[in-house]
Amino acid sequence: MTYNKRLFTSESVTEGHPDKIADQVSDAILDEILKDDPNARVACETTVTTGMALISGEISTSTYVDIPKVVRETIKGIGYTRAKYGYDYQTMAVLTAIDEQSPDIAQGVDKALEYRNDISEEEIEATGAGDQGLMFGYATNETETYMPLPIFLSHQLAKRLSDVRKDGILNYLRPDGKVQVTVEYDESDKPKRIDTIVVSSQHADDIELEQIQSDIKEHVIYPTVPEGLIDNETKFFINPTGRFVIGGPQGDAGLTGRKIIVDTYGGYARHGGGCFSGKDPTKVDRSAAYAARYVAKNIVAAGLADQCEVQLAYAIGVAEPVSISIDTFKTGKVSEAQLVEAVRANFDLRPAGIIKMLDLKHPIYKQTAAYGHFGRTDVLLPWEKLDKVNVLKDAVQA
């Protein structure tokens, strides 16, 4: 029997990938600032390369943070603890070039927003977006996490690749690594099987390729992928270049915000272009993307669509979003216009409203900086809540 199959591929990277090192460092600095100053304005960019890290950006805060210490602790936690790994938290140089947030931006964002549980309506209305831009959120019912299967499995495999290294199961692995998963969909657009898995992991110099391939299948792939998705036709490419000894920042420079598709939906949904890491929640690139995921996930969980993509757009200094758009890809149980109306009535999508709704002024961001910001099963994130399901059901029936 033949059918019209469709293949879709997504990728993830481990926490030791250079770009992910940069994301984690930026968010570790953000978290450290938010611990003492929840009203801080942070736009923190990190560059990592051989033997050094450069921290730049704009930070306005009333607290003090030992940035080099935070950088070194983050690098140590990732696993770059010896010079032979190509990067060493003890001997690397840490350079800083930090300015304050531009007063031209600050005056349009927030004049007097104070950190307290009960933010007044006047303060919410007075808090404008930190920039113009468009953000997307997405959800699908093809997995229990409301994420597309290719990116979900990619993250699970990347996390497992890191875990077997840190737990000493495969102690010859090194921190840098990448995973890619190709899923085959059937004629009903449901996941049917895994067509291809690609794993590349940095490793010690004296390990044979055949051992790496066998160990990664046994300890990473088979324990992670749900039974029935791998079959005799599934293709495996494990360290297909044959050698991956030089890795991390020694192999490639890393920059904050270079893995925006890994951070979101693996290319399965659209992306507005703005990254997340290193940005405080007044930056709608981050907070509005979280809110859009929150909206989309609750719509799908309410049974109002099998898939849902939400677009939000903002103008700098303006509180209300300039547009809200919803696409259910012809899977909606009610019209998209009804969904937009229900969302407008039940979600406060102004920047300060999002911060209040999702309680975003806390140091919760470093844990999002590797293995995805959405659909996580290992950490609890406020934009993954399903507390609007009944509200949305009632709203579309009214």
Swiss-Prot record:
Name listed for the protein in its UniProt record: S-adenosylmethionine synthase
Gene label: metK
Chief location: cytoplasm
Cellular component, GO annotation: cytoplasm
Co-factor: note: Binds 2 divalent ions per subunit.
Region feature (Flexible loop): 101-111
Lineage: Bacteria, Bacillati, Bacillota, Bacilli, Bacillales
An example molecular function term from Gene Ontology annotations: ATP binding
Function per UniProt: Catalyzes the formation of S-adenosylmethionine (AdoMet) from methionine and ATP. The overall synthetic reaction is composed of two sequential steps, AdoMet formation and the subsequent tripolyphosphate hydrolysis which occurs prior to release of AdoMet from the enzyme.
UniProt keyword terms in alphabetical order: ATP-binding, Cytoplasm, Magnesium, Metal-binding, Nucleotide-binding, One-carbon metabolism, Potassium, Transferase
HAMAP family linked to this entry: S_AdoMet_synth1
List of residues binding K(+): 45
Family note: Belongs to the AdoMet synthase family.
Native source organism of the sequence: Staphylococcus haemolyticus (strain JCSC1435)
Gene3D superfamilies: 3.30.300.10
Subunit structure as annotated in this protein's UniProt entry: Homotetramer; dimer of dimers.
Broad EC category: transferase
Annotated PROSITE patterns: ADOMET_SYNTHASE_1, ADOMET_SYNTHASE_2
Residues annotated to bind Mg(2+): 19
Subcellular location: Cytoplasm
E.C. number: 2.5.1.6
